Design a protein with these regions (language model features):
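A short glycine-rich beta-alpha junction/loop motif
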Residues: 114-120, 151-172
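Short, solvent-exposed loop/turn positions at domain surfaces
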Residues: 19, 24, 41-42, 79-80, ...
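A short beta-sheet element
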Residues: 56, 81-140
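Short ILV/T-rich hydrophobic faces within alpha-helical DNA-binding bundles, principally
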Residues: 2-10
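Short, structured motif recognition centered on aromatic/hydrophobic residues
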Residues: 25-30, 52, 86, 90-92, ...
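Sequence-specific dsDNA recognition surfaces
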Residues: 33-43, 59-90
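Non-catalytic DNA-recognition/assembly elements of restriction-modification systems
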Residues: 8, 19-39, 200-206, 211
Length: 222
């Protein structure tokens, strides 16, 4: 990054913080707070019992939640040398799926080690609260945008570069932390009810989704 690019980035962050102070939040494009890159190329056949932590796009749909500090699988150090990595606080997003509902499912990587990331993914490197962004990417606010970005018939895809145009209502980092704390409690409560009656589970899940979307919707200060 050149000195001029660094100055522009600093100016942009200053404007964002000023708007957050005045209005309580600011609508920003993902490109203003993050960079997006594609994942690597390892496959399931490369999995091993120990080695370098790795996140495979297929497991983001089925095995991961909002965030993770440990991976489910590993790959060897030799294979990992040529792979793309997610560092702590990055968002790893699966950008292909069989349906619009599941495409762009993501996980905030909070592990201490870098994690190798498979293909069919986007690695979002940013300067915000990772879990806040992960919750946003699971919300109806994002769903409406990704429907416009998605393309394909049998395989639905969102091109990683197009994610940069996603608009996010962004409060201050302190407010992001407060929202994450509340949503984490809801998430834990829903998980604790996972062995209950189906109707009860569904009702609590809908309640959780409602409050999640409300917490991620902002109005300007008067």
């Amino acid at each position: 990054m050149t000195d001029r690019q660094t100055d522009r980035q600093t100016d942009r962050q200053t404007v964002i913080k000023l708007c957050q102070y005045v209005f309580g939040f600011v609508n920003v494009k993902l490109s203003e707070i993050a960079t997006v890159s594609r994942g690597g190329s390892f496959q399931k056949k490369d999995f091993c019992d120990e080695g370098v932590p790795c996140i495979h796009y297929g497991q983001i749909y089925t095995r991961y939640g909002i965030s993770a500090t440990k991976t489910i699988q590993f790959i060897s150090e030799d294979i990992a040398k040529t792979q793309k990595k997610a560092v702590t606080n990055d968002i790893v997003m699966a950008v292909t799926s069989e349906n619009v509902e599941d495409v762009c499912k993501c996980v905030a990587w909070l592990g201490e080690e870098d994690a190798a990331v498979s293909g069919h993914t986007a690695i979002i490197h940013h300067n915000q609260n990772a879990k806040f962004l992960s919750y946003f990417f699971h919300s109806s606010l994002f769903f409406a945008q990704k429907k416009r970005l998605a393309h394909g018939v049998k395989v639905i895809e969102v091109t990683p570069d197009k994610l940069l145009n996603v608009v996010i209502p962004l409060p201050s980092v302190e407010e992001q932390e407060r929202i994450v704390d509340i949503l984490d409690r809801f998430d834990t409560l829903c998980s604790d009810l996972s062995s209950g009656l189906p109707a009860e589970i569904e009702a609590r899940q809908k309640q959780y989704e409602y409050y999640r979307d409300k917490l991620l919707t902002f109005t300007a200060k008067e």
